[in-house]
Amino acid sequence: MSTENTLSVADLARENVRNLIPYQSARRLGGNGDVWLNANEFPTAVEFQLTQQTLNRYPECQPKAVIENYAQYAGVKPEQVLVSRGADEGIELMIRAFCEPGKDAILYCPPTYGMYSVSAETIGVARRTVPTLENWQLDLQGIYDNLDGAKVVFVCSPNNPTGQLINPQDLRTLLELTRGKAMVVADEAYIEFCPQATLAGWLVEYPHLVILRTLSKAFALAGLRCGFTLANEEVINLLLKVIAPYPLSTPVADIAAQALSPRGINAMRERVRLIVQERQHLVNGLQQAACLEHVFDSETNYILARFTASSSVFKSLWDQGIILRDQNKQPSLSGCLRITVGTRQENQRVIDALRAEPV
């Protein structure tokens, strides 16, 4: 047998994967800090006790207790809920279910969350971008002009990394523009910090609306990797065709069900109250730093701030063990750093470090 024209492992891989730049998660970027304010996590751990002892059995595909608890919490029917390995899997499922590689596209509006782009590129689906306007609101005309061939439109509200809500009237206009043309995915990962802004009540009006949620932020369970997709039953049934047979392990489902109990939800709301209080303390302290240009309003558990010399500020705090998220490479975010709201002690360390920075 001939061994001519043999291919390397890299040659055997798909071309788009060879060229792919992976999403740079906070943990992937590393660092040796002791104050981690770069991943929008809750700053302290929540304790749970496992109640299920059936690890010899495969778990349910869609654990009933988790689905029912989340449906009650979100104000929707259980048939309108899908649980997955974080909201990131929900992004991937939407693209896999609705986009033909090499034919269809997704559309998103930077600056925004990076996994929309990475998921599409991994699957081989084209990406279209319509940058937001100067106030980080939707460019509706630009979206309309680029809708042809776009099957899924991703909108993050509150937006990561800018922290602001998308104008609800603009969201309604977007849903009307896309009716019969594309699915609209509203990423509500941070909605617990502004629950009045959820679009869950709109599902009955818009069959093409899909909402992503997570337990990673206000529920303080980033390490659990548990997210939710809210949509009309027809959409959920399509997603069930492409999701893995066992997306949640038994321990994950056990803890998620506890977190979504009345007691767990009350605890989450108390955490939100504390974070909002600490967010204001952090903002007040930042405004006294000479190196600060502007701190932007936020509806989330993080703030975005522009500095006169953000690269040196980022490195200086990094060297002091304070790890922030550099947003310089995002469109329209030159000079910006994103800071997760931490504990009072962590926030004060940030404030003190920034006050010591030169102009």
Swiss-Prot record:
GO molecular function: histidinol-phosphate transaminase activity; pyridoxal phosphate binding
PROSITE patterns referenced in this protein's UniProt entry, alphabetically: AA_TRANSFER_CLASS_2
InterPro entries: Aminotrans_II_pyridoxalP_BS (IPR001917), Aminotransferase_I/II_large (IPR004839), HisP_aminotrans (IPR005861), PyrdxlP-dep_Trfase (IPR015424), PyrdxlP-dep_Trfase_major (IPR015421), PyrdxlP-dep_Trfase_small (IPR015422)
Keywords from the UniProt entry: Amino-acid biosynthesis, Aminotransferase, Histidine biosynthesis, Pyridoxal phosphate, Transferase
Gene3D superfamilies in the record: Aspartate Aminotransferase, domain 1, Type I PLP-dependent aspartate aminotransferase-like (Major domain)
Top-rank lineage group of the source organism: Bacteria
Family classification: Belongs to the class-II pyridoxal-phosphate-dependent aminotransferase family. Histidinol-phosphate aminotransferase subfamily.
Protein name as annotated: Histidinol-phosphate aminotransferase
Gene field: hisC
